[in-house]
A protein has these predicted regions:
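ADP-ribose/adenylate-binding Rossmann-like module
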Residues: 75-79, 86-112
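Short loop/edge segments at beta-strand edges and connector loops
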Residues: 42, 60-64, 104
Length: 255
């Protein structure tokens, strides 16, 4: 394996995307999601990038690439459709000690951008060492089907519990046993079904900690738009009036 798997904190760091097309747009948006200070070099921006620039979320550097654009940059992504320009970006970045990723050119990448399956703070990455983005995309889609929004809720609960349990001073072995027992319980099934009282009961029974899910915003998000007192499963979409009208139009065929 060539690449060392690592998570980089780029919040507040200057990151440069060279190329203002659709590929550059995707790269810039992903950098923004991680809190980077993003600049984009290109003659014309896509509509989405133009909107980000007008909102002050990115800096547009009009024109063609110049080595001076790398001054003070933490990492750069080369996303132009000119291979010679991309090669020059990589060469200049190496000379200046700037981390570089050249799109569709794994031999000129100091780092790769894996496919992401994200549920809140839960992030699962898929990387193929740059050999097959298509396979990485397929695996990401399968992961998204397997790990739904209930995992985001569980992670919120685990994060809330972690400090409280560690502060009891029971030792790492006992703490690990408690956490593993909780994630191996039926708590995920209760979350999927919106059975919040059962979720709280399972947590109390296994950990000895009484938690209130409401301050975490969990119950509110799980029951949003449901005013009839019934439990709404996490991740399930309720039929809207528009959906209902569409369903009424579908009639069974006569024999």
């Amino acid at each position: 394996m060539r690449y060392y798997p690592i998570g980089l904190d780029i919040s507040g760091r200057r990151c440069l995307v060279i190329g203002a097309g659709e590929v550059g747009e995707r790269k810039a948006q992903r950098l923004l999601e991680c809190g980077a200070r993003v600049s984009v070099v290109g003659r014309e921006l896509t509509p989405a990038l133009s909107g980000l620039a007008q909102a002050g979320r990115i800096v547009h550097i009009p024109g063609d690439y110049d080595e001076g654009h790398l001054e003070g940059v933490f990492l750069v992504i080369g996303a132009t459709d000119d291979r010679d320009v991309n090669k020059r970006i990589y060469r200049d970045a190496r000379k200046r000690g700037v981390l570089a990723n050249i799109v569709d050119d794994p031999d000129r990448c100091d780092f790769i951008l894996p496919a992401l399956c994200r549920q809140g703070d839960l992030v699962i990455t898929v990387a193929t060492g740059g050999k097959s983005p298509a396979l990485a995309k397929k695996l990401r889609q399968e992961l998204e089907e397997r790990y739904g929004p209930e995992y985001e809720v569980l992670l919120k609960i685990m994060g809330e519990l972690r400090a409280k349990i560690i502060d009891r001073g029971q030792g790492p072995d006992e703490n690990r046993k408690i956490f593993e027992t909780l994630v191996g319980s039926d708590i995920l099934e209760h979350i999927r079904k919106g059975q919040w009282k059962k979720v709280e009961a399972v947590v109390k029974d296994i950990t000895g900690v009484a938690i209130d899910l409401r301050p975490m915003g969990i119950q509110a998000s799980g029951r949003k738009g449901n005013n009839d007192g019934r439990k709404r499963p996490v991740g399930k979409k309720q039929a809207t009036s528009k959906d209902t009208k569409s369903m009424k139009k579908v009639r069974p065929a006569r024999p």
